[in-house]
């Protein structure tokens, strides 16, 4: 018996394997990570607008990215992540988690 090739990702296969008919036809999925964790609503409580959040997070993500790029050169001009980064976690996700944990000071308009 051969198994047909498919473009279905492994996570989708796992979700199907975890299907529980008693849940009303809903599959069981892991908690999403990245841009949805921490929740955007909780991040918006820490700034005045969604636009301020975008600028704030983008500036911090750029600092984190520059920090990683400078490690090989021995230059430590920028502060690295203030939270423990996950495996292959993007700088923007790290910045969002730092904002959520109130680890940064920010003055809007800078």
Curated annotation (Swiss-Prot):
GO terms for biological process: DNA-templated transcription. It catalyses: RNA(n) + a ribonucleoside 5'-triphosphate = RNA(n+1) + diphosphate. Its EC number is 2.7.7.6. It is an enzyme of class 2 (transferase). Keywords: DNA-directed RNA polymerase, Nucleotidyltransferase, Transcription, Transferase. The keyword Nucleotidyltransferase applies. The keyword Transcription applies. One of its GO terms (cellular component) is DNA-directed RNA polymerase complex. SUPFAM superfamilies: RPB6/omega subunit-like. Belongs to the RNA polymerase subunit omega family. Promotes RNA polymerase assembly. Latches the N- and C-terminal regions of the beta' subunit thereby facilitating its interaction with the beta and alpha subunits. This is DNA-directed RNA polymerase subunit omega. The gene is rpoZ.
């Amino acid at each position: 018996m051969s198994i047909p090739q498919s473009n279905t990702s492994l996570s989708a296969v796992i979700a199907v394997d975890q299907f529980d008919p008693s849940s009303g036809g809903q599959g069981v999925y892991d908690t999403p990570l990245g841009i949805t964790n921490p929740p955007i609503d909780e991040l918006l409580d820490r700034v005045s607008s969604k636009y301020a959040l975008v600028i704030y997070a983008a500036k911090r993500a750029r600092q984190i990215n520059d920090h990683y790029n400078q490690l090989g050169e021995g230059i430590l001009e920028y502060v690295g992540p203030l939270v423990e980064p996950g495996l292959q976690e993007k700088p923007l996700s790290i910045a969002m988690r730092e904002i959520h944990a109130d680890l940064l000071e920010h003055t809007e308009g800078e």
